[in-house]
Amino acid sequence: MMKIFNTLKNKKEKFKPINSNIVNVYVCGITPYDLCHIGHARTLVFFDIMIKYFQYKGYRTNYIRNITDIDDKIINKAFHKKEKYNLLSDFMIKEMKYDLNSLNIMPPNNEPRVTNHISDILEMIKILLEKKHAYISKTGDVVFDISTYRDYGKLSKRFEEKKQLLNNKKNKINFKTKKEKDFVLWKMSKPNEPSWKSPWGHGRPGWHIECSAISDKTLGNIFDIHGGGSDLIFPHHENEIAQSKCANSKFNVNFWVHTGMVMFKKEKMSKSLGNSCLIREIVKKYDADTLKYFLTSSHYRSQITYSVDNMEKSKSAVKRLYRSLHNTNYFYNLPIKEKFTSKFIDAMNDDFNTPKAYSVLFSISRQINYFKNKNPEKANQLSTVLKNLSNIIGILNENPDSYLNNKLKFSKDKINKIKSIIKKRENYRKLKQWEKADEERKKLKYIGVCLEDTIQGTKWFKL
């Protein structure tokens, strides 16, 4: 039985798709005004794992991840760069795809852009106005009136906003003036800003209405999972629920799923705070597997803190897994009776518990190392299991030899020195002078080399 934590209910609930053989997922995507940082990566990596795991379990998936390609941030940056907003967003979308490809993240089934759904957005706004859930402010903006939605605050558990607005209504505040907590559905454009024609004048959509209209258009008003980072719970997802439910009372999402924040020195990592680490910078400094391990070694709902120490620990952990695959045939198709797969499934069925899943992977790794010389066939069988399960989490996609060796990074003189020490160690081993042999191994470790003794001889690779 699979359970997923539902933010709306604040508890884990049994997951059963609305349609028995397909899982429909909508995730709020990026606003392409700058390069993606590892805060974005955490959400994107997690939902990639979710989709891969559903597919592993035999479900078909329909994964929608929107792109907010019109936004104040895009307009402001384009203005300062003296270029058209759409050229900026197009360029950043290409850069996003480059980063996600470097992390081996699958593309969604559909990646709708807001600017391609203006008509759907206008239609939903018209309905909200007709049903008296929205009003036109003195500035001409179309604004959603949250006091008209009785369950406002249910997702975020922030009910004070609703209470405040009800008091405002009781005290007969002028509704032509936008109230503090109400949010814009359609924003009137300023001169020289990008805009679209509407019944209320030229303007552009507000942030929250975009996802409501696009999810309704692509998945309908009832679907399985809506997700994003935990910073979207309020106000974005709270507002989405309000406007979607008011536009169509049948609207329902079974599970609201949110990832925890990536922290940097006790602050949320974000571009606006100037403390973000770009995906491409981290991949270049470490590698994709190390970054993905760091992002998934803690439970997806918890906060994680980026630090050099945590990245080095992640790098070391990934290398341990690759070392166990080293000198094995992980494409070995002979079936094996093993307990690890069921334990891995139990972990993932428990709200995608990747830390527990990793403990299973490391158990397999230890078994592979144990059987490498004693029973190579069993080691090969277990390597196949490790490779297949790791690929669900999205790691161990590289060839172990090429990942571990990187011998080209050593100079020719250093490689000769390494080979000389290995030869000396082998001579000590033949003479059964184990302490001296161990001293030679320590010398290699000191210069950044790890050894593996196999039936074929001693292999070395870079730490």
Swiss-Prot record:
<dbReference type="InterPro" id="IPR015803">
    <property type="entry name" value="Cys-tRNA-ligase"/>
</dbReference>
<dbReference type="Pfam" id="PF01406">
    <property type="entry name" value="tRNA-synt_1e"/>
</dbReference>
<dbReference type="GO" id="GO:0005524">
    <property type="term" value="F:ATP binding"/>
</dbReference>
<keyword id="KW-0067">ATP-binding</keyword>
<keyword id="KW-0479">Metal-binding</keyword>
<dbReference type="InterPro" id="IPR024909">
    <property type="entry name" value="Cys-tRNA/MSH_ligase"/>
</dbReference>
<feature type="short sequence motif" description="'HIGH' region">
    <location>
        <begin position="30"/>
        <end position="40"/>
    </location>
</feature>
<dbReference type="GO" id="GO:0008270">
    <property type="term" value="F:zinc ion binding"/>
</dbReference>
<dbReference type="GO" id="GO:0004817">
    <property type="term" value="F:cysteine-tRNA ligase activity"/>
</dbReference>
<keyword id="KW-0030">Aminoacyl-tRNA synthetase</keyword>
<dbReference type="InterPro" id="IPR015273">
    <property type="entry name" value="Cys-tRNA-synt_Ia_DALR"/>
</dbReference>
<feature type="short sequence motif" description="'KMSKS' region">
    <location>
        <begin position="268"/>
        <end position="272"/>
    </location>
</feature>
<dbReference type="InterPro" id="IPR014729">
    <property type="entry name" value="Rossmann-like_a/b/a_fold"/>
</dbReference>
<feature type="binding site">
    <location>
        <position position="211"/>
    </location>
    <ligand>
        <name>Zn(2+)</name>
    </ligand>
</feature>
<feature type="binding site">
    <location>
        <position position="240"/>
    </location>
    <ligand>
        <name>Zn(2+)</name>
    </ligand>
</feature>
<dbReference type="GO" id="GO:0006423">
    <property type="term" value="P:cysteinyl-tRNA aminoacylation"/>
</dbReference>
<feature type="binding site">
    <location>
        <position position="28"/>
    </location>
    <ligand>
        <name>Zn(2+)</name>
    </ligand>
</feature>
<protein>
    <recommendedName>
        <fullName>Cysteine--tRNA ligase</fullName>
        <ecNumber>6.1.1.16</ecNumber>
    </recommendedName>
</protein>
<comment type="similarity">
    <text>Belongs to the class-I aminoacyl-tRNA synthetase family.</text>
</comment>
<keyword id="KW-0963">Cytoplasm</keyword>
<keyword id="KW-0862">Zinc</keyword>
<comment type="subunit">
    <text>Monomer.</text>
</comment>
<feature type="binding site">
    <location>
        <position position="236"/>
    </location>
    <ligand>
        <name>Zn(2+)</name>
    </ligand>
</feature>
<dbReference type="GO" id="GO:0005829">
    <property type="term" value="C:cytosol"/>
</dbReference>
<keyword id="KW-0547">Nucleotide-binding</keyword>
<dbReference type="InterPro" id="IPR032678">
    <property type="entry name" value="tRNA-synt_1_cat_dom"/>
</dbReference>
<dbReference type="Pfam" id="PF09190">
    <property type="entry name" value="DALR_2"/>
</dbReference>
<keyword id="KW-0648">Protein biosynthesis</keyword>
<feature type="binding site">
    <location>
        <position position="271"/>
    </location>
    <ligand>
        <name>ATP</name>
    </ligand>
</feature>
<keyword id="KW-0436">Ligase</keyword>
<dbReference type="InterPro" id="IPR009080">
    <property type="entry name" value="tRNAsynth_Ia_anticodon-bd"/>
</dbReference>
